[in-house]
Amino acid sequence: MKIAVLGAGAMGSMLGAYLQLGGADVTLLVRRKELAEKFGAPGIVMRSYTGADGEKTEIGPIPMKAATDCSGLDVMDAVLVMVKGCDTKSALTGAASIIGENTKIITLQNGIGNTDIIAESVNKDNIYYGCVNMSAIMSAPAVLDTGLFGDVNVVFGSVTKGEDQKKFGDELAGIFNASGIKAAYTEDIDTEVWYKLLVNISVNAGCGLVRLRGGEAGNDQDFTLLAVDMLKEAIAVAYSCGVKLDFNYFMTHILPVARKTSGLHYPSMAQDMLMKKAPTEIEFINGAVERLGKKAGIPTPVNQTVSRLVRTIERNYDKQYQDKSAKSGPSFKVKISDKFCKGCGYCIKYCPKKVLTAEDGLNAKGYVKVKVANQGDCIGCLQCSTVCPEAAITISKED
């Protein structure tokens, strides 16, 4: 099966790598030429920490075909869409030459609403959608720190229910399963997608607004009450769409697992709002609940308020308050804990002043050794400590 991945960031390139391991002929489509070259040689490396002692498991390198545009590419059997929801329409327009009459389009993007955008240009019989129980961070070009959780790692269904759709769905799931992860095609996909939406509603936008990691926010009483209010609104809207969700089941079986896996991380929307200053997926998460609630005549005041706050932040990144003292440079000190640092390198990637760098060689875990190279250049922006998944970095202000 010839498959192209639109949006080969951390999640897209991980899924593409697994599809190739399962026997598919995969092409990754990325914006940056240098990243496409890294995907090709030496290839993608997927690594994860397992066990209490932080043992590392590693797959790869996996040489991948990659391109920055679709010129010269054949029509694909399938296209996996992994861009942000706000980029779905433009991504499909750019990929028009590789989408034929029988090409299947699969979206495993966050939230609800992407299938409607895809259906504007693609026959509904060829549209598949679902969600993933996986995580990935690209700590260096073509190097992924990954995690798998849940009983099934990739679950998806189709807009049109029929024998042809089931046949393709089972074939695609078989490719994923052959790679070593668990995948399934189901006709009850809306339940899975809505439960995943609840996970995102409970942590994503809220963490960005209060500037906390998932675990930190989840331990706060008022944040939890806010999340519960948003969840109850979403469940009411889901019922209006014919999807029956169990609040108690979600709170006792799904949310604890999600919090455990994301406790030390900033959710994707928080990263967009705090570090990247980038467009978020609010319209496909809380905004989707707001939009569908209006259509069904169901009030969603909490999700609406959160959506409005996020939109306000997005429109005004360049006007946000900044502590003027953060420009004094030498008055800030960066300290890295050797005990907690696992060497993912994410802090190096996001430091705007290149205060942090990698030493020659690897640390005891076989990862990057991070060091402070230019202490005096630190502006106290907290980007490094914000993105550190192990809370290994502290920034102190010196008198």
Where are the model-predicted features located?
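NAD(P)+-binding Rossmann beta1-loop-alpha1 motif at the extreme N-terminus of oxidoreductases
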Residues: 1-56
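Rossmann-like NAD(P)(H) cofactor-binding subdomain of soluble oxidoreductases
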Residues: 56-145
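Rossmann-fold dinucleotide-binding core
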Residues: 74, 110-192, 196, 202
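NAD(P)-dependent Rossmann-like dehydrogenase/reductase catalytic/cofactor-binding core
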Residues: 177, 226-329
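Active-site-proximal catalytic alpha-helix in oxidoreductases
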Residues: 190-218, 222-235, 261-263
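Ferredoxin-like iron-sulfur electron-transfer modules
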Residues: 326-343, 360-380, 395-399
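Iron-sulfur cluster-binding cysteine motifs and their immediate structural context
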Residues: 346-363, 383-399
